[in-house]
Structures are given as C-alpha cells and as structure tokens.
Amino acid sequence: MWMLLAAVLGSPAALESRQADQASLARIARGDHAAFAELYDRHARLVYSLALRILQHGADAEDIVQEVFAQVWAQAARYDPARGAVAAWMLTLTRSRAIDKLRAKRARPETAADASAAESVVDLAAAQDLELLSAEQVTRLQRGLKELPDAQRTALELAYYEGLTHVEVAARLAEPLGTVKTRIRQAVIKLREALAE
C-alpha cells in the first residue's frame, strides 16, 4: 500500500523528505558513509517491505535490500534529481531486482507456511505505513479505491500489490499494454484527487 501512497501523496513533508534524500545522495557520491547510513535508516524498511511484498520471502527480501543499497552507493554520482525523487528511484531499483529474482525462482514452489508468514509481515508493514497518514487521508484513500472503476482498480492492484509489470498485468487481463498503462495512470490520478479533497 505504501508504494501506492508514495505515488499519490505530494505533501510538504514529502517535499522536505525528497530534499533531504537528494542532499544525502550528493554526500554519498562524495563517499560520505554517515550520509549513506542516514539514507539507509530512512528507506531500508520501505525497500524491504516492497521486496517482501513481491517475493513473499524474508531472506530474499533482505538480499534485495543489500543489493539496492549497494547499487545506490555505486551509482549515487549518476543520480539525476530531474528524473524523480531518490525514494522513487530506490523503489524502482527494488521492484526491478525483486521481479528479476521472482522470475528466476518461479520454478521453486512456495510452501503455504512461507506465504502465510510473509503475508503477516506485509500486513504489519502496510498497517505501520498507514499510521503515517491521518485518519482522514486513509478514509479518502480507501473511498477513492472503492470508487475506481473495476478495470482501473484491478490493473492498479495487480501492479502495486502483486508487483506485476505492466506487461504481466496486460497478459493476465488479456488487455492491450497501452490500455493497462492508461488505466493505472488514470487510477493514480483519481486517487491523488481523492486525497486532495
């Protein structure tokens, strides 16, 4: 849920956080270990939550966290703030790496116990992220989700909650890729509007 929230929220606090992240990344590019630790403290839980949501396996999610932060360290100097927020970049790295790992592991079936344990952790992480929002914002978001047309809500849920790529969503729904992308984009716009009310 938090990834969806990140896509629709644009508060002053979010702007301040983006600026702090950009400053940290500039320091990391100069080899500042303290800045790296600060960025890790701010985002490791978020990166882990997304990886766990996609992979449904704690150890694999931890591996992704390490890989993402190693990549952040190595590529900090190449980051371009004009292309988006640091957190969005890190979540994109996380999602890509987790989906790659998931595809590589698809041949190995998961046990019901593994899936159940992972769902519990994901539910807890989502609940903690919702605590960051006001009760009114949560209500608006939930109402906005319910008011989405079924086709938009389904495409959005598959992309954000199940970690599917747009191509995979299109295949699962037997819809053209362009249609799926439009539905997801329209759903995010409607949720932003619902939160702004």
Predicted features along the sequence, with ranges:
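Intrinsic, short, N-terminal disordered tails of RNA polymerase sigma-factor systems
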Residues: 1-30, 38, 114-154, 158, ...
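Amphipathic, Lys/Arg- and hydrophobic-enriched alpha-helical face
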Residues: 9, 40-58, 74-75, 91, ...
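Sigma70-family region 2
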Residues: 29-30, 53-57, 67-83, 104-105
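Residues within the DNA-recognition helix of helix-turn-helix
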Residues: 43, 64, 183-190
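Structural recognition of an alpha-helix C-terminal capping motif at a helix-to-coil junction
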Residues: 49, 63-70, 84-96, 182
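Arg/Lys-rich amphipathic alpha helix in sigma70-family domain 2
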Residues: 74-78, 92-113, 134
